[in-house]
Amino acid sequence: MKKKILKITCIFLLMAVTTFVIFLLCFFQEIRTIKCLKTYDVKDLYSLNYYADYGFDEFIKVGAKNWDECVEYMKKKIAKGLAERIDVLGTNCSSFVVYNEKGEVLFARNFDYTYSPVVMTTTNPENGYAMIGACDMGFLRFAKEGEIKAHRLNLTNATVLYCPYFTTDGMNEYGLAMSVLDCGYAKISTIEDAPTLTTCSMIRMVLENAKNVDEAIKLFKSYNISLEKPNHHFMIADATGRSVVMEYTEDGIVAFESSVVTNFDLYDSRHRGVGQDRY
């Protein structure tokens, strides 16, 4: 009887160890990514080196017609059921490009709404340029201080695996920077047979594949975009200091020179939307 119990116990232990090893092999890079989450003296500012495969090359080939499709892709491809916490919130914001006293180009942006932690996410994809992007965790329903704990491996922190798809602004290794902002009006012209991207994945697509503003504009105009309410426009700037705002108009996608943008349309002086007091 004792031998039988011992045998059964050994079998269960072997199964448990085998399951654990398989889990580690399947999720090693995801676990490594979650564990490297760091915090700083600045309140609710985090950084993350992203080691896992976030499947972006595959994603931009097929795209997502709306945020729901993007969320479903993330759940299946990235988190594999580890994290389910996703929501999409609206924003108001400002962005501008200036030179400092040394003649260096500075790209600035802010979010004009309530509390939200930010994870600065560094990625270095095999088929694209290295970049650092800001992921606003308010999009992922983090609304309380201290919800995210650095160096913790838990289901709450597993949500950071979604960060590459919630890049609201960032800069790549060539100094190309980009941000997305709400605006009052947008008319979308469809490009036949082109994939559709969400606003945040459009930023990542550009920053992983363009070195300067000209390359960014060309890439930008080769994709459709899902502009669910509120509508959006984009600021793009490169290391030379050149900056443009991309807007969707009755005439299609328009890129025009501007060093400041908030939440109203700049094209054709329509000025529809909010944020004129910040402009």
Predicted segments, located by residue:
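Positively charged n-region of N-terminal signal peptides that target proteins for export
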Residues: M1-K7
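A sequence-level detector of short, solvent-exposed, charge-rich linear segments
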Residues: E126, I225, M235-A239
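Noncatalytic linker/hinge segments flanking ATPase motor cores
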Residues: D136-F139, G146-H151, F220, S259, ...
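Short, well-structured alpha-helical segments that form the helix of a local strand-helix-strand
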Residues: V213-N224
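Extended amphipathic alpha-helical segments with heptad-repeat/coiled-coil character used for oligomerization
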Residues: P230-Y279
